[in-house]
Amino acid sequence: MHRQYHFVSDAEAHSLHSVSYTHLTLPTNLFRVIQNNEKLAYLLGRLYLSINGELAFKQNKDRLKGVPNILDDVIETSQIFYDASWEDIQNAAAFLENQVYSFSSTGQTFGIARRDMSQRLPRLMSAYNRIRDAIILHRDYKDVITYAACPGSFILLDPPYKGTEDMYSKANFDIEQHDILFSFMSEVNQQHHGEVKFLITYNNDPYIRGVAEKHGFDTFVQTRLHSMKQSKEAGALYEELLIANYDLEKQAAANHLYLD
């Protein structure tokens, strides 16, 4: 039986298995609240009364300014992890509301389109079932993968896409970090002789595809609907680049899945 880790970093790299340290950052706080069934109950009630208004959006932004969003060294205790506080729930609700109600989910600019928060509540219940036994790590992805990688494990990475680096200013993920990411994962692949499998998702960028292939990784372009463009351009498509250290099509067939 393989252990699974989910980790959260400002660079948005996510691994598969679930063991983590909790930091009082915005995404981490949300995950921690979802994990605790008592907190989740309060959160669902709070979000059910959510108001999609510009004033509420600005109030949430002001609330979240005081919440740290850096890789702090926080010493965890069971009390920190399990204590339910109304402040945690309010911050989690404010963060989720501003992700849903903002333009392009940046949390910074109010989006005019009406959105019903109640439609998101079943997703939170699903998230609870998936991560209730997880520990959420908030560390640099290289530190987490070095710690967690072992034969038989699988790692999923969802880094900032090429051209969106400015949206992750607090993560210090500039354009050079793409090359660093691939070099690091190549080292992981060699160190574990290919017994640690990983999948990286990107936008279909020629430079990224070239770097991936230079390291000998398999690539596949997956076409799907571009959800952010459907209101103005129905049927608009988006090309997602899948990168792995294994044969993607062969593995998909083994799992009775099909890439197109």
Where are these regions (language model features)?
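Conserved small/polar residues in nucleotide/adenosyl-binding loops
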Residues: 22-28
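Conserved SAM-binding loop of SAM-dependent methyltransferases across substrates and taxa
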Residues: 4-15
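Long, positively charged, glycine-interspersed low-complexity recognition regions
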Residues: 175-260
